[in-house]
């Protein structure tokens, strides 16, 4: 599943290719995504509109139109975005496309079809967008994401720390890969209760999460199976994994074997010596 770094990389790659372009027509494969594809509304209200800017909120990408309408995309498990010449044959799992005024097509490809595309019409878009985002936590690379915020958010909770930082109501965009890597960098066992985390550990964890995410963005994201950027290229942060997917391999710090167990239903990787429970 694309996490924050992958979505950010896609946004950065797509933005210069579609901003300033006008949507000429929209279309779809007829196969349903996680939500029904609003093709009638898009054909009526988005055609003829200029794309003015793109924004990311967590794992959502918002495409703003010049009349105030907003197209909101979530990539789900296997979603990909790209821009192609209209003459180029569409791929098997291209389920949505926008024809642009420069004879290019902006295409959404999704093998497993767990992603979603919403259209927020002008006049209601801001209200609907705020409703969509109101339960999301802060951006981990934003100013409000601090150790004090994490400590306060953990009050009264008994979650494992890994489940806590993967909860989008607490903080957005941190999936399984970056939760594992951040906790290893912070030397915190993923199964520890949030109530056991000391203030200095909150400070270290907040810092490590930001460092890991920024490093991943610099590396173009992580390509495990499906992720490619807007130009079809792969990320290479996976070459920097310290624990994720490395069960029984030596810890890069102490050389002891990396362990793995299910926490919150997700595979968790950690060094039992460097990350004590």
From Swiss-Prot:
Task: Please tell me whether the keyword Hydrolase is annotated for this protein.
Answer: yes
Keywords, alphabetical: DNA damage, DNA repair, DNA-binding, Glycosidase, Hydrolase, Lyase, Metal-binding, Multifunctional enzyme, Zinc, Zinc-finger
The protein's matches in InterPro entries, at most eight in alphabetical order, are given as:
DNA_glyclase/AP_lyase_DNA-bd (IPR015886), Formamido-pyr_DNA_Glyclase (IPR020629), FPG_cat (IPR012319), MutM-like_N-ter (IPR035937), Ribosomal_uS13-like_H2TH (IPR010979), Znf_DNA_glyclase/AP_lyase (IPR000214), Znf_FPG/IleRS (IPR010663)
Q: Which cofactor does it need?
A: Zn(2+)
Positions contributing to DNA binding = 93, 112, 157
DNA damage found in the keyword field: yes
Q: Where is the active site?
A: 2-3, 59, 266
Coiled-coil annotation: which residues?
A: none
Q: Name one GO biological process term.
A: base-excision repair
Q: Where are the zinc fingers (FPG-type)?
A: 242-276
Q: Which reaction does it catalyse?
A: Hydrolysis of DNA containing ring-opened 7-methylguanine residues, releasing 2,6-diamino-4-hydroxy-5-(N-methyl)formamidopyrimidine; 2'-deoxyribonucleotide-(2'-deoxyribose 5'-phosphate)-2'-deoxyribonucleotide-DNA = a 3'-end 2'-deoxyribonucleotide-(2,3-dehydro-2,3-deoxyribose 5'-phosphate)-DNA + a 5'-end 5'-phospho-2'-deoxyribonucleoside-DNA + H(+)
Mind listing the GO molecular function terms for this protein?
A: 8-oxo-7,8-dihydroguanine DNA N-glycosylase activity; class I DNA-(apurinic or apyrimidinic site) endonuclease activity; damaged DNA binding; zinc ion binding
Q: Extract the CDD domains matched here.
A: EcFpg-like_N
Enzyme Commission designation? 3.2.2.23, 4.2.99.18
Q: How is the cofactor bound?
A: Binds 1 zinc ion per subunit.
Subunit details for this protein?
Monomer.
Q: What does this protein do?
A: Involved in base excision repair of DNA damaged by oxidation or by mutagenic agents. Acts as a DNA glycosylase that recognizes and removes damaged bases. Has a preference for oxidized purines, such as 7,8-dihydro-8-oxoguanine (8-oxoG). Has AP (apurinic/apyrimidinic) lyase activity and introduces nicks in the DNA strand. Cleaves the DNA backbone by beta-delta elimination to generate a single-strand break at the site of the removed base with both 3'- and 5'-phosphates.
The record, for HAMAP family, names: Fapy_DNA_glycosyl
Q: What does the similarity note say?
A: Belongs to the FPG family.
PANTHER family membership: FORMAMIDOPYRIMIDINE-DNA GLYCOSYLASE (PTHR22993:SF9)
Put simply, this protein is called Formamidopyrimidine-DNA glycosylase
What is the organism field in this record? Desulfotalea psychrophila (strain LSv54 / DSM 12343)
